[in-house]
C-alpha cells in the first residue's frame, strides 16, 4: 500500500462562518485524501479540545495554530507511514499530542489528518469510503433523524429542547425516507406561516419559531406530518435532543421557566413518551448526572432509546462507565468529540458489543465534507443525525447516502423501524 508522501492544511469556513481545519494528504501513488473538521455549538465538557488561536482575528476562533500543527508537527511525524495502517497512524497522532484531551496539537488538527488519511487510503484502494471502512458486508442505510424544528443552543428562541426530529421509519428505502422528510419539512413551513410564526432557520436547517412550550413544537410537527399525508407513529416517529446540560446548574434543571429535579424531568419525559410516538431522547439529563441517567434508563429504557451525547462524548472510557452503571442505551457518534477515526470505531464497537444502539451525528458547525455518511453505513449505525433537509452542508450528507444506496443497488437495506426495537405504538 502506498505510504504518505505529503501533508497539508488550510483554514476554511464552516456553516456558521467560523474557521475550521481542512487537511489534505497525498500518497506516493498520487492519491489525494481531503477532510474538513466540524465544530459544535453545545459541547460536552469532556470532549477532546479544539485548538483555537485566541486574539482578535475571527473573534479568537481562528485555527492557524492547528494548521501549523498539521504542517509543522504532524506531517513530518507520519511521513512514509502506510496509509492503510490507520490504528498505527492514530496511535502516532495521540502520542505526538501527549495530552488526555488532545489540547497540545488540537483535536481539530488530529481529526483532520486521521480522516484525510482514511479517505486517501480508500481512494488508493479503488474503494468507496464506506466499503473501505466497513468491508464487503456494509449495506445498511440509516434512518435520517431530521431536525426540522430547532431550539436551545441552535436557535435564539425560548424553546428549551434543542432539536425536534422526525424519523421516517415506515419508508422502504433511504431515498423514500428523504423524500418523506423533505415533504414534511415543507409542510411544517406552511403550518408555521399559517400560524403567523417565524420560518427562519437555525444552525442545522430546522425552523426556529418562538413557542410558549416544548409540547407546542411537537404538536406543530404532528400537524405538518398529517398535512403532508403521512401517519404519525407508523410512517413517522419523533425524536428529541434535549441537550439538558445547557440548562443544568447547581443540581437543578431550569426548564420552561422553573427549576426541576432529575426525577421531575424524568416524569416530564415519561409523559411525553405516553403522549407522542417518541422513539429516541438524546441527553435528557446532564453530562455529570450519572444517578439521574441510571434512574431514567431503569424507568424508560425499555420503551425508548436514550442517547448519550455529552454523557459519553464518543469516548470508550466514558461509555464503559455508562454500560457498567446502566446509564443510557445508545451512543451518539461524533468524530470530533474524540479526535481520531480509530477511537471513534472503538467506541462504536464497544457500544455494539454491549447492546447499545449508535446514531452517527454531524455538528452544528459543518462543512461540505460527507465522511459521516460513509461512516454511518460502514459501521451499521442504522441512524444518522445530520440536520434538516435544507442548507447545503446538511443536504451534502443526505445526497451522499443517496449515492451509496444507488451504488449498493439490490444489496442496499434501509434500517427503518428495525433501528428502534424499543419503539411503542403510543401516540
UniProtKB/Swiss-Prot annotation:
GO biological process: glycolytic process
NCBIfam families for the chain: eno
Catalytic activity: (2R)-2-phosphoglycerate = phosphoenolpyruvate + H2O
MF annotations from Gene Ontology: magnesium ion binding; phosphopyruvate hydratase activity
Signal peptide: none
Binding site for (2R)-2-phosphoglycerate: 162, 334, 363-364, 385
Cofactor note: Binds a second Mg(2+) ion via substrate during catalysis.
Physiological role: Catalyzes the reversible conversion of 2-phosphoglycerate (2-PG) into phosphoenolpyruvate (PEP). It is essential for the degradation of carbohydrates via glycolysis.
Protein name from the UniProt record: Enolase
Pathway: Carbohydrate degradation; glycolysis; pyruvate from D-glyceraldehyde 3-phosphate: step 4/5
Location of the active site: 204 (proton donor), 334 (proton acceptor)
GO cellular component terms given for this protein: cell surface; extracellular region; phosphopyruvate hydratase complex
Family, per entry: Belongs to the enolase family.
Keywords associated with the record: Cytoplasm, Glycolysis, Lyase, Magnesium, Metal-binding, Secreted
Location(s), subcellular: Cytoplasm; Secreted; Cell surface
Domain of life of the native organism: Bacteria
Gene3D superfamilies in alphabetical order: Enolase-like C-terminal domain (3.20.20.120), Enolase-like, N-terminal domain (3.30.390.10)
Keyword Lipid metabolism assigned: no
EC nos: 4.2.1.11
Pfam family, one: Enolase_N
Cofactor(s) listed in the protein's UniProt record: Mg(2+)
SUPFAM superfamilies: Enolase C-terminal domain-like, Enolase N-terminal domain-like
Residues that span the membrane, as ranges: none
Residues that, per the record, bind Mg(2+): 241, 282, 309
